[in-house]
């Protein structure tokens, strides 16, 4: 899905209205022209648009996601980016079969774990890759050794938690390249 279509996807959920913008104002407030960094080619080939001007708990409401962890109380390990951006990720296969802790220990130098808001954005933009799967956010802690995850059922999504060393079938860690584009 193109970045322009991803932005339109968020518009369809009313993100522009939440920000007090018209559709045109919202479209003009973000960049749709992004170029994949050469070092990401073949590793992080999926661009995804992340909206950070709306708090995660409000995005969850707009998107109709069931919140079983109280998103407002999550702890993010990555520095929070305070502008909308495009990040580059994979199709969930990069760390297939690994626990969250195993994923940490196998990060590439150019890689970081996704936060819950990034996992949500990825799932909204690439639903066909996510349906029937659990997607771990290895940079967002729920409590102790439990991390935020998004479970993508056929008809709905739920924000839940997943233990750092659990190897549940059909759970995947989402990571991305460290660089993002404003």
Which residues does each PLM region occupy?
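A binding-site-centric feature that preferentially detects glycan-recognition modules on secreted/surface proteins
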Residues: 1-112, 116-182
């Amino acid at each position: 899905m193109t970045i322009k279509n991803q932005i339109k996807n968020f518009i369809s959920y009313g993100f522009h209205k939440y920000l007090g913008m018209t559709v045109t104002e919202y479209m003009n407030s973000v960049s749709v022209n992004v170029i994949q960094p050469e070092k990401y080619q073949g590793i992080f080939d999926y661009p995804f648009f992340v909206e950070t001007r709306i708090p995660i708990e409000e995005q969850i409401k707009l998107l109709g996601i069931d919140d079983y962890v109280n998103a407002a109380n999550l702890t993010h390990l990555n520095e929070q980016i305070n502008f909308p951006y495009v990040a580059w990720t994979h199709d969930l296969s990069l760390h297939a079969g690994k626990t969250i802790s195993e994923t940490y220990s196998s990060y590439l130098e150019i890689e970081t774990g996704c936060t819950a808001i990034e996992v949500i954005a990825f799932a909204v933009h690439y639903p066909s890759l996510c349906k029937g799967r659990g997607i771990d956010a290895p940079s967002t802690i729920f409590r102790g050794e439990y991390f935020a995850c998004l479970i993508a059922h056929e008809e709905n999504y739920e924000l839940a938690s997943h233990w750092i060393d659990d190897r549940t079938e059909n759970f995947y860690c989402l990571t991305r390249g460290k660089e993002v584009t404003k």
